[in-house]
C-alpha cells in the first residue's frame, strides 16, 4: 500500500487501451529486456495477442508528465524560499526543516530538467498486457523503464490492471509465476497484493526419442545463444 501511495503522489496518468498503446508498451518491454539481459517477445507478437483476443485483451500504461511535475516543483521551491525569508532566525527547528526541503526540491528540479532533455515532456514509465478468458484474467507481460523506478509506477499499474479485470467481470486475476523458493524481488513485489499461490509440478520434457532429442536440444541452444549475441 505504501508504494502504491508513493506512485499516486507522482500524479501518474494511467491509460487503458489496445493497439494504439502498442508502441509505448513495446518500449518499456525492451527496457526490461535490457535491464535483465533477456529476450522476451517482439512487438509483432504482442500485436498478435491483441488481434487474437480482441476486446478480451488490453494494455495498461502509466505516463509521467515530467514537465508538469517540474513546474509544480518549481512553484514549491519558490514558496520554500519565501518561507525561509520570513522565518525568524530563532525558529531553528522550522528553519532546519525548510533548509532540508529546499535542498530536496533543488535535487528534484535538477532531475526533472535532465529527464525532460532525455525523454521530452511526457514519458511512458511502465505497462502491462492482459488477456481475459471466462471469469479470470492473466497479466501476461509487464515492463518498466528503470530510469523512473523511483516513481513506484508498477505497483499502481498492476493494481489498476487488476481493478480493471474485476470491472470486466473477472473473479480472479493471475499475476504469473514466482520463484519456487518464495524469495526474491518478484515475490516481494507481488506479495503486497496478498495473492493466493497455486503450486504446480512445473514444466519438463519427456523425450520420445533420446537420440533425436539430444541433437535437437544442442541445436536449439546454439540458435538461442546466436540470437542473444545478435540482439
Where are these regions (language model features)?
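A conserved beta-strand-loop-helix scaffold within acyl/acetyltransferase catalytic domains
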Residues: 1-149
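Glycine-rich loops and low-complexity Gly/Arg-rich segments
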Residues: 6-9, 38-41, 85-88, 154-155, ...
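Short, intrinsically disordered/low-complexity patches at protein termini
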Residues: 38, 48-49, 83-84, 106, ...
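Active-site/acyl-donor-binding loops of N-acyltransferases
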Residues: 168-231
Amino acid at each position: 500500500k505504501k508504494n502504491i501511495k508513493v506512485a499516486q503522489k507522482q500524479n501518474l496518468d494511467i491509460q487503458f487501451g489496445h493497439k494504439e498503446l502498442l508502441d509505448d508498451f513495446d518500449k518499456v518491454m525492451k527496457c526490461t529486456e535490457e535491464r535483465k539481459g533477456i529476450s522476451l517477445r517482439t512487438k509483432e507478437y504482442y500485436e498478435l495477442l491483441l488481434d487474437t483476443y480482441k476486446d478480451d485483451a488490453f494494455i495498461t500504461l502509466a505516463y509521467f508528465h515530467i514537465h508538469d511535475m517540474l513546474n509544480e516543483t518549481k512553484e514549491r521551491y519558490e514558496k520554500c524560499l519565501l518561507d525561509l525569508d520570513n522565518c525568524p532566525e530563532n525558529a531553528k527547528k522550522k528553519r532546519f526543516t525548510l533548509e532540508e526541503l529546499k535542498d530536496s526540491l533543488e535535487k528534484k528540479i535538477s532531475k526533472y530538467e535532465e529527464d525532460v532533455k532525455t525523454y521530452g515532456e511526457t514519458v511512458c514509465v511502465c505497462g502491462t498486457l492482459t488477456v481475459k478468458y471466462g471469469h479470470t484474467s492473466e497479466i501476461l507481460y509487464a515492463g518498466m523503464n528503470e530510469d523512473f523506478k523511483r516513481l513506484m509506477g508498477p505497483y499502481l499499474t498492476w493494481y489498476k490492471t487488476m481493478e480493471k479485470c474485476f470491472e470486466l467481470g473477472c473473479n480472479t486475476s493471475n499475476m504469473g509465476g514466482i520463484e519456487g523458493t518464495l524469495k526474491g524481488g518478484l515475490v516481494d513485489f507481488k506479495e503486497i497484493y496478498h495473492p493466493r499461490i497455486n503450486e504446480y509440478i512445473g514444466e519438463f520434457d519427456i523425450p520420445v526419442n533420446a537420440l533425436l532429442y539430444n541433437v535437437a536440444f544442442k541445436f536449439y541452444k546454439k540458435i538461442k545463444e546466436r540470437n542473444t549475441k545478435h540482439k
